[in-house]
């Protein structure tokens, strides 16, 4: 299977057993970059090509059969994954599989080195890509305090932008903390999540990664549409304030829901 994606997502497919060629689409290269990308892709005549981006590239790809994704307007009642799988319904009625990230022994050894003998780890994702999606750090601290009897250590994950939040968290929280925010790539992050007992975070990619490595998670939504964009899986819990004000959600309230689950 050949895939077109951006540079950030490439590493996720690094160990995928089905991957043929990963074509990077770099928006910074402009029209020249798109032209070069198309020239490379058009060297292959595909049996099937599927559009999940609506960026027009599918019209220029050589393929015996082309399938386009359904519009947002026609699928407002569906989860985003269900919407995307509708694109291939004409060729398969197979159920939507559980999300998965392929991790190698290298990443597994990395996670063992970082975590050592620590078990019962609570992983936290303190950041997101928009302020309206970010739960205050102090609320995460209250959550961790409320759950301290269930977990031996807190693992902080996220991007370089989240490192400042990690520093604040460590000043406020008195328990054991392993800070990896801004220090790992996506596969290393996935491996660390796989060694954790539970993940709690904002509406960000980390919640989806938690589902993809098979651990239970709790996503705290501010603005956003959890019915469409929550992590997939029976063990993926979520909560959203009715008024979409994430800051007023109490740490103890989320902790109580998690304790009922675990």
Residue map of PLM features:
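Catalytic machinery of carbohydrate-active enzymes
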Residues: 1-262
């Amino acid at each position: 299977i050949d895939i077109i994606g951006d540079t950030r997502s490439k590493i996720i497919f690094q160990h995928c057993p089905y991957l043929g060629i990963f074509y990077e689409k770099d928006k910074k290269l402009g029209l020249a970059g798109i032209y070069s990308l198309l020239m490379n892709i058009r060297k292959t005549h595909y049996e099937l090509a599927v559009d999940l981006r609506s960026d027009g590239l599918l019209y220029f790809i050589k393929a015996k059969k082309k399938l386009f994704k359904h519009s947002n307007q026609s699928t407002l009642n569906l989860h985003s994954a269900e919407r995307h799988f509708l694109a291939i319904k004409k060729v398969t009625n197979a159920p939507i599989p559980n999300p998965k990230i392929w991790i190698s022994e290298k990443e597994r050894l990395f996670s063992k080195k970082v975590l050592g003998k620590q078990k019962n780890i609570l992983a936290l994702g303190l950041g997101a890509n928009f302020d309206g999606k970010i739960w205050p750090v102090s609320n995460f601290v209250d959550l961790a305090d409320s759950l301290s009897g269930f977990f031996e250590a807190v693992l902080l994950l996220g991007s370089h932008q989240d490192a400042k939040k990690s520093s604040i968290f460590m000043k406020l929280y008195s328990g054991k903390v392993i800070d990896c925010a801004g220090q790992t790539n996506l596969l290393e992050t996935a491996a660390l999540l796989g060694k954790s007992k539970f993940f709690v975070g904002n509406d960000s990619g980390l919640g989806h990664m938690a589902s993809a490595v098979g651990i239970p998670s709790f996503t705290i939504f501010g603005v956003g549409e959890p019915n469409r964009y929550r992590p997939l899986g029976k063990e993926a819990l979520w909560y959203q304030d009715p008024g979409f004000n994430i800051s007023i959600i109490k740490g103890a309230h989320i902790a109580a829901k998690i304790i009922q689950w675990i």
